Amino acid sequence: MSVMDLANTCSSFQSDLDFCSDCGSVLPLPGAQDTVTCIRCGFNINVRDFEGKVVKTSVVFHQLGTAMPMSVEEGPECQGPVVDRRCPRCGHEGMAYHTRQMRSADEGQTVFYTCTNCKFQEKEDS
């Protein structure tokens, strides 16, 4: 037995056949070759060691919950401080606002205004 064969048959630790017993990486599935070789470290395992091993997978889909419709009064678009700004749609004086950092950090924030009367929304880059 050569030194290379000895290195490939001695493992660093004991593990399940799904993992390389030398480096711990996930092993590829056995193919037509006589050995399964770890892609990361090159450790070899005889393909006969996998005889009788059953691989079972399952996919579980969880049902999505139904979203509760938001009432106009509860919506996030109505939250925030109110400023003296005239709504371009209904002419009402007073719009709620909130800010978000939509662009890169060295750019200004984006201010979102919402009319407290008709819920019209507009944005302004500052």
UniProtKB/Swiss-Prot annotation:
Could you tell me which cysteines form disulfide bridges? none
Pfam families found in the cross-reference section: Zn_ribbon_TFIIS (PF01096)
Q: What is the primary gene name for this protein?
A: POLR1H
The Gene Ontology terms for molecular function here are:
DNA-directed RNA polymerase activity; nucleic acid binding; zinc ion binding
Note the PROSITE patterns from the entry: RNA_POL_M_15KD, ZF_TFIIS_1, ZF_TFIIS_2
Q: Where in the cell is it found?
A: Nucleus, Nucleolus
A GO cellular component term found in this entry reads:
RNA polymerase I complex
Q: Which residues cross the membrane?
A: none
Subunit composition and interactions? Component of the RNA polymerase I (Pol I) complex consisting of 13 subunits: a ten-subunit catalytic core composed of POLR1A/RPA1, POLR1B/RPA2, POLR1C/RPAC1, POLR1D/RPAC2, POLR1H/RPA12, POLR2E/RPABC1, POLR2F/RPABC2, POLR2H/RPABC3, POLR2K/RPABC4 and POLR2L/RPABC5; a mobile stalk subunit POLR1F/RPA43 protruding from the core and additional subunits homologous to general transcription factors POLR1E/RPA49 and POLR1G/RPA34. Part of Pol I pre-initiation complex (PIC), in which Pol I core assembles with RRN3 and promoter-bound UTBF and SL1/TIF-IB complex.
Zinc finger motifs (C4-type), residue ranges: 20-41
Q: Which SUPFAM superfamilies match?
A: Zinc beta-ribbon
Record family assignment: Belongs to the archaeal RpoM/eukaryotic RPA12/RPB9/RPC11 RNA polymerase family.
Task: Report the SMART domains cross-referenced here.
Answer: ZnF_C2C2 (SM00440)
**Residues binding Zn(2+) 2:** C87, C90, C115, C118
Location of the motif Hairpin: 106-107
Record note on domains:
The TFIIS-type zinc-binding beta-ribbon domain contains an acidic hairpin motif (residues Asp-106, Glu-107) that likely coordinates the nucleophilic water and magnesium to cleave the scissile phosphodiester bond and release the mis-incorporated 5'-ribonucleotides.
| Protein known as | DNA-directed RNA polymerase I subunit RPA12
Its annotated function is as follows: Core component of RNA polymerase I (Pol I), a DNA-dependent RNA polymerase which synthesizes ribosomal RNA precursors using the four ribonucleoside triphosphates as substrates. Can mediate Pol I proofreading of the nascent RNA transcript. Anchors into the Pol I active site to monitor transcription fidelity and cleave mis-incorporated 5'-ribonucleotides.
Q: Chief location of this protein?
A: nucleus
Gene Ontology biological process: nucleobase-containing compound metabolic process; termination of RNA polymerase I transcription
Query: The organism's lineage?
Result: Eukaryota, Metazoa, Chordata, Craniata, Vertebrata
Q: Where are the zinc fingers (TFIIS-type)?
A: 83-123
Keyword Transcription applies: yes
Q: Where does Zn(2+) 1 bind?
A: C20, C23, C38, C41
Provenance organism: Homo sapiens (Human)
Q: Glycoprotein: is it a keyword of this entry?
A: no
Which controlled-vocabulary keywords does the entry list? DNA-directed RNA polymerase, Metal-binding, Nucleus, Transcription, Zinc, Zinc-finger
